[in-house]
Amino acid sequence: MKPSNFNGIKKYFGRKKPSIQEIVREPTAGGIVFRRNKQGELEFLLYQDARERWTIPKGHIESGETAQAAAIREVGEESGLKDVESICWLGKVNFRYRRVDKLVLISQQNYLIRPRTSGDEIKKEEWMTDIRWFSMQDALDKVEYEDIGKLILLAMKRIRQEGF
């Protein structure tokens, strides 16, 4: 005897996704933002998105804008930090997702960024669940995207090399 919802389950899983009609390329930029707290300990800035995943400030590169300028702008817009500087390029992360009948290809350029002053307070955007500073280990424990974890480790290496 079939369960009463068998036909509904069969109908749901039997659906076919629409075929991909278009490939969309979206260049983006992000920042691994770091600082030294009052005790001199290194911290990294992460925010929690609507899906409750911790990640870094990032967003689309606008027309005529460099990836580095976009990373600095996005960090400011998403964190409230007004005076930041880009230290160096850390690398590119590529990922993709499907949006109905479109395949979206993201190419994200990432930069090591730090606040120039210690007085700026971070602010949470309404679409964020949370935003805060984490120790390196806590940041690595929080991020769910493996590539972002690798970027944090690379950032740590560069920070030590440069003596920040």
Model-derived features with residue positions:
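A short gly/proline-enriched turn/hairpin at secondary-structure junctions
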Residues: T55-G59
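A short, flexible beta-alpha/helix-coil linker loop
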Residues: R51-W54, A139
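Unchanged
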Residues: I61-K150
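Short, solvent-exposed loop/turn segments that connect beta-strands within catalytic domains
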Residues: N37-E43, V100-L103
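Short, acidic/hydrophobic/Gly-rich beta-strand patch recurrent on exposed beta strands
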Residues: L45-Q48
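Acidic, metal-coordinating catalytic segment for phosphate/diphosphate chemistry
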Residues: K2-N37
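A small-molecule sensor/coupling module
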Residues: L151-R158
